[in-house]
């Protein structure tokens, strides 16, 4: 704190000789934290700092009530924070009971549910006698507390996902695949929301705002290139539209393929060869060539129609506003190559992680896409966002395919398979580069995994995305991280 800032507060018009003048809010050091067997070093240092402050003549530390966020960094982008109202806030919310001393929800759920959480101030108007004591009450308005809001979020799961991914530029969504309850929403790196309550110095703000990893950026609200996690969606569209069957053999093309010479130098590449080249194997080996061919068989018109029906270029019905998934920059797939690239989650396809998780719910709910929700409901029943988008037989066939991705030893998600239950999932590595020959581009690593059995006592669906996985294992890096989360969720098998 600068001396001139302190002087400014001390010389305010309301200040009297015996006034306690608030200068800055600081975190209270709790005695229990200091008595821990291995107390946090930052807490110990803060205690020493406060002891030094109290040795300064005229300095006092007084307790005040402020909003506290116990999950701190773990749920910053989800919960958000409140701040003191600005002149703009007062103008925008004129007549809604805000004063210069009010706080208001700025981001996250604090902003979404500001009206419900705010409550109403109380007041009393009275006539005072010459000594300032109440003589006659003229009017009285009782304080009305804000509502308590209970979420579907599992705090332990939220914390575990954050812990596992906190050093990455990532986002994760966790849902109950049979109800639509959202169990976790994590964006990393993150920040301590309590810092906004206590007040930040310019230096602190600049450090946070200029961090190259962008801790203030909410990644789970954005759209990203999905890579191979999109292949089960293409599989379902192809089967539903009868463009092909699961047993159609697309033929072995080796590691590189193009439809014909009209594609110029452009080729679709894949990593593995196998036989027969049918849907189940294409999912197991994550074959780009198979799904490029699948997209061409589906055709542009059917692809656009089906993806639109799945909620692309539309808003997600959810408490927090999410960016809209899209299959093209202008709602139309422009070329044959663009259509082929769409088949394996490249091209201009961008998907919101929550949206992708919702689409995956259709594979274990007879082809119905469930509506996600955050507000807890007793004895909640699943609500359908998009009904019967796929038939029961189609969703079952795709589900069997993505079970194999995790449980077949050749599957790209085999590292997460368990002996005590069947999981289903799909890996994805999306390339972000200027051209096919560009070797300087980055990669996004994806993994979607779920418990497809309704009898599972702890059902879960996780979609995780990590930026910059090139050179550190691609999607395998994400599989490893999610495995640790599931081991904690279920217990190691």
State where each predicted segment sits.
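Conserved, well-ordered alpha-helix/loop/beta-strand core segments that scaffold catalytic motifs
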Residues: 130-171
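Short, gly/Ser/Thr-rich active-site loops of penicillin-recognizing serine hydrolases
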Residues: 382-384, 479-493
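Envelope-exposed proteins and targeting segments
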Residues: 57, 74-77, 145-149, 168-170, ...
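Alpha-helix C-terminal capping segments
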Residues: 49-54, 161-166, 374
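Short, charged, low-complexity patches
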Residues: 106, 356, 474-486
